[in-house]
């Protein structure tokens, strides 16, 4: 053994080829500080051996290296620029040491080689992947750029255009796609991986392969004619801006770094990367996106723990077909859990099956599935007009019309047919779970399971704990949601649960602006372009449906009359009463037609303005700051109330609920990250300016105390 540490082992194989194996404790290899220090020491030990002729890098895990240890980032990035620069330079010195070894090097890649893992393989002369390998530089998804030489080496290995696409999108690349562009030199079967890598090194030692020329290319400026370079970088900037926009600076910074470094050798090029990396690491966007990554890991970790308490879910049922039931059935069946789809009407069953078939056909058309897989998934969905097939289900999801009496009746009925230990969940967006439980004989085996529409696209599921829901029930539904490929958060029962409870104060702020003559299209523009929502409030209400919004608003007003009760009609009432229901009937705040691709197309409709003018008088202009304040303050305060009341367990879960359930702008990180970035004291001062507008704008005592102590919701 040449070198051994808890994360890396180096041994000498036959023919004086050394093997460096990444094999950290735990399930995966990460590039944390310990591994980086071990790699540095291992390379020093290797350099001291006079007989080594080549080096192969391998992994003792099912995957190569998944990337840096992102849990270290927020603390590290809070350091002074000088400290951060020192860390980046020290890390890069290790990668340079690997690249500069006086003999050929190769990486044997299996599973993920992402971020720092990808930058490791780029520092070697040869890269051999097995068929399971996925390679990529996902750093821009965290608001930063590669910091261990990725922006320097990748363009010199696969060309500027390919490298810019890889880096700016942050997408993982399959082994065969990496081979096409030259990121890897060969793709082999998993069992042949190490042998193939060693053979390539033997050929290099025997001078059958010119490893020195390959290495020199990475150390030199990019070989790109001036005109071609100008066209390449100009095109990349245009494409990046159209996708990333102004709120996500990292992809554009990556293009600029590759462009500026194109004429430089390795040393100067790396300095350009270092400076851009440090600048981005200090941004609020990086803090927000890294926070989302960590919160996602936290939420998924909680779901994994819940799985230990969960009852196994081998079969399921959904009551109520149609679009929602069909979506739930598709999601369950496509992830491997057979499901019965029960309805009282054959046309509804047909609609549900057609919905599932449509989603599957789209996957086949995109090459993401095959007709055989599609048939298998459809065979996992059993349509039924009677309850009999439901009796074997481990979990039954009720998804009938959003009406308390109808739901209560269906829940009481199905309970008579299911097994003693079956779990029943209601897919409701607003109705109290504890109220619905009153119709059931076993309320402890009942909870809420709120899917978001469209089911196949929206990652969040709210699992609602009723007054009597048992821990096994909650754990089992959380585990089932995870098995369906969803991100579950557990919330306690209250009107609107968590997501809708915090959404409707936002709509109330919007209604308040319209009541004073605000222009809904102008408000949408500010909330989309400046704040960063995927849809402004008017457009979102049209998509949700003004009838749905009208009903949910009434539920919220009844549940929280002091804050959400209202006197007189608001804009939602005006649209609803004039049968303007949104996209579903072609007219809401906007008018809708169908474009050439069959998608809804929105247009300004003068009728909407006439109706609002008749109700609220002449239009009045509001500036962007006021629009943002008056819509967002109510949502933020209500989110804080949910945390204080224990409706949601942590800032992390609240923020993930907002990002995954509502599309809260990821670059802002969620309400609690946004509050911490803004400063709680600054927010309280802003809210106080609008406190005269009512309870939705009045901060809680706990918020005021936190502000006075200069506190924050996250501990950095």
Curated annotation (Swiss-Prot):
Residue segments, region Enoyl-CoA hydratase/isomerase: 1-189
Positions marked as site (Important for catalytic activity): 119, 139
Active site per UniProt: 450 (for 3-hydroxyacyl-coa dehydrogenase activity)
Associated pathway: Lipid metabolism; fatty acid beta-oxidation
InterPro entries: 3-OHacyl-CoA_DH_CS, 3-OHacyl-CoA_DH_NAD-bd, 3HC_DH_C, 6-PGluconate_DH-like_C_sf, ClpP/crotonase-like_dom_sf, Enoyl-CoA_hydra/iso, FA_oxidation_alpha_subunit, FadB
One Pfam short name: 3HCDH
EC numbers, comma separated: 4.2.1.17, 5.1.2.3, 5.3.3.8, 1.1.1.35
Cellular compartments per GO CC: fatty acid beta-oxidation multienzyme complex
Catalyzed reaction equations: a (3S)-3-hydroxyacyl-CoA + NAD(+) = a 3-oxoacyl-CoA + NADH + H(+); a (3S)-3-hydroxyacyl-CoA = a (2E)-enoyl-CoA + H2O; a 4-saturated-(3S)-3-hydroxyacyl-CoA = a (3E)-enoyl-CoA + H2O; (3S)-3-hydroxybutanoyl-CoA = (3R)-3-hydroxybutanoyl-CoA
Molecular function GO terms recorded: 3-hydroxybutyryl-CoA epimerase activity; delta(3)-delta(2)-enoyl-CoA isomerase activity; enoyl-CoA hydratase activity; long-chain-3-hydroxyacyl-CoA dehydrogenase activity; NAD+ binding
Region ranges (3-hydroxyacyl-CoA dehydrogenase): 311-716
PROSITE patterns recorded: 3HCDH (PS00067)
Binding sites annotated in the UniProt record for substrate: 296, 500, 660
BP term (GO), one: fatty acid beta-oxidation
Binding residues annotated for NAD(+), in chain numbering: 324, 343, 400-402, 407, 429, 453
The entry's keywords: Fatty acid metabolism, Isomerase, Lipid degradation, Lipid metabolism, Lyase, Multifunctional enzyme, NAD, Oxidoreductase
HAMAP family per record: FadB
Function noted in UniProt: Involved in the aerobic and anaerobic degradation of long-chain fatty acids via beta-oxidation cycle. Catalyzes the formation of 3-oxoacyl-CoA from enoyl-CoA via L-3-hydroxyacyl-CoA. It can also use D-3-hydroxyacyl-CoA and cis-3-enoyl-CoA as substrate.
Family statement drawn from the similarity comment of this UniProt entry: In the N-terminal section; belongs to the enoyl-CoA hydratase/isomerase family. In the C-terminal section; belongs to the 3-hydroxyacyl-CoA dehydrogenase family.
Subunit structure: Heterotetramer of two alpha chains (FadB) and two beta chains (FadA).
Name of the protein: Fatty acid oxidation complex subunit alpha
């Amino acid at each position: 053994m040449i070198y051994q540490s808890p994360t890396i082992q180096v041994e000498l194989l036959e023919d004086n080829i050394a093997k460096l194996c990444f094999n950290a404790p735990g399930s995966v290899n990460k590039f944390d500080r310990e591994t980086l220090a071990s790699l540095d020491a291992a390379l020093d030990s290797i350099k001291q051996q006079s007989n080594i002729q080549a080096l192969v890098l391998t992994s003792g895990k099912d995957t190569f290296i998944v990337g840096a240890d992102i849990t270290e980032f927020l603390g590290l990035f809070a350091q002074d620029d000088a400290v951060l620069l020192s860390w980046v330079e020290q890390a890069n010195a290790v990668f340079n040491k690997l690249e500069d070894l006086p003999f050929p090097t190769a990486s044997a890649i299996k599973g993920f080689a992402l971020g720092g893992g990808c930058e490791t393989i780029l520092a070697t002369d040869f890269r051999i992947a097995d068929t399971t390998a996925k390679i990529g530089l996902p750093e821009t998804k965290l608001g930063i750029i590669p910091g261990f030489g990725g922006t320097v080496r990748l363009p010199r290995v696969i060309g500027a255009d390919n490298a810019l696409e890889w880096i700016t999108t942050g997408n993982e690349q399959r082994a065969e796609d990496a081979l096409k562009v030259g990121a890897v030199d060969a793709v082999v079967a998993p069992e042949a991986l190490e042998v193939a890598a060693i053979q390539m090194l033997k050929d290099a030692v025997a001078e059958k392969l010119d490893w020195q020329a390959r290495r020199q290319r990475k150390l030199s400026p990019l070989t790109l004619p001036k005109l071609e370079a100008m066209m390449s970088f100009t095109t990349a900037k245009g494409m990046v801006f159209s996708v990333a926009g102004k709120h996500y600076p990292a992809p554009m910074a990556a293009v600029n770094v590759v462009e500026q470094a194109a004429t430089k050798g390795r040393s100067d090029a790396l300095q350009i990367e270092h400076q851009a990396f440090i600048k981005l690491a200090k941004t609020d966007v990086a803090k927000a996106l890294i926070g989302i990554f960590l919160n996602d890991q936290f939420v998924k970790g909680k779901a994994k723990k819940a799985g230990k308490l969960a009852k196994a879910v081998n079969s399921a049922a959904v009551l109520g077909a149609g679009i929602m039931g069909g979506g739930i059935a598709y999601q369950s069946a496509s992830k491997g859990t057979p499901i019965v789809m029960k309805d009282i009407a054959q046309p509804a069953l047909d609609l549900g099956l057609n919905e599932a078939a449509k989603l599957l056909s789209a996957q086949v058309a995109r090459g993401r599935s095959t007709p055989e897989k599609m048939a298998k998934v459809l065979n996992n969905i059993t349509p039924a007009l009677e309850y009999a097939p439901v009796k074997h289900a481990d979990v039954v999801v009720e998804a009938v019309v959003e009406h308390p009496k109808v739901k209560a009746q269906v829940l009481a009925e199905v309970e008579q047919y299911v097994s003693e230990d079956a779990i029943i969940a209601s897919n409701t967006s607003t109705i109290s779970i504890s109220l619905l439980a009153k119709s059931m004989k076993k309320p402890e085996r009942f909870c809420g399971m709120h899917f978001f529409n469209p089911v196949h696209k929206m990652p969040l599921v709210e699992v609602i704990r009723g007054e009597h829901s048992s821990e096994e029930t909650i754990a089992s539904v959380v585990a089932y949601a995870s098995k369906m490929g969803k991100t579950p958060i557990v919330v306690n029962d209250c009107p609107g649960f968590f997501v809708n409870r915090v959404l409707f104060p936002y709509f109330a702020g919007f209604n308040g602006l319209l009541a004073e003559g605000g222009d809904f299209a102008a408000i949408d523009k500010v909330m989309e372009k400046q704040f960063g929502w995927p849809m402004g409030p008017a457009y979102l209400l049209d998509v949700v449906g003004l009838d749905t919004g009208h009903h949910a608003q009434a539920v919220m007003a009844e549940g929280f009359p002091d804050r959400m009760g209202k006197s007189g009609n608001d804009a939602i009432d005006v649209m609803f009463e004039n049968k303007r229901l949104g996209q579903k009937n072609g007219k809401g705040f906007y008018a809708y037609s169908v474009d050439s691709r069959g998608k809804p197309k929105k247009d300004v409709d003068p009728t909407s303005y006439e109706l609002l003018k008749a109700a609220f008088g002449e239009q009045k202009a509001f500036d962007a700051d006021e629009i943002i304040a008056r819509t967002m303050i109510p949502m933020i305060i209500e989110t804080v109330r949910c945390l204080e009341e224990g409706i949601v367990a942590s800032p992390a879960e609240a923020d993930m609920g907002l990002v995954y359930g509502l599309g809260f702008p990821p670059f802002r990180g969620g309400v609690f990250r946004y509050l911490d970035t803004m400063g709680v004291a600054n927010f309280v001062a802003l809210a106080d300016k609008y406190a005269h507008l009512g309870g939705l704008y009045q901060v809680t005592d706990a918020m005021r105390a936190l502000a006075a102590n200069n506190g924050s919701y996250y501990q950095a």
